[in-house]
């Protein structure tokens, strides 16, 4: 956590800092400040000098559903758990955190388009993995439930000696 910065950008270029734990030097921080979260991992990291991933945990960020404060606040309070893969280290609990800058700063952004998650690792002494990421929008943005049903017009199966023989299906 100590050398990481994370930013979310919407299609028109507006952005917020999700967290900024890097407060030192290295390749140079992308954002000013940082809470110096060194020695704390996100997930159960395998810090043995290899490039093998550890065990990914789920970290969510929400202005309204957060169980915890910002990662900076929780780090300052010492709210960490012991790691199992790298004994003697601590990791942030998997939970829902407040972002450092409110998602309200993205009001007015177009929903359609490319949303970008920028994560910067400022020190080359370790590695990191993103196991999964997603973004969910408030359903009130588009309250019209949209669904569709495909109707099979014609379907055929062609027997053959291989499981890779094609099946032909037409939808209408």
Residue ranges of each PLM-predicted region?
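Loop and turn regions of beta-sandwich accessory domains that flank beta-strands and are enriched
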Residues: 1-150
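Surface-exposed, flexible coil segments in extracellular/virion-facing regions
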Residues: 155-172
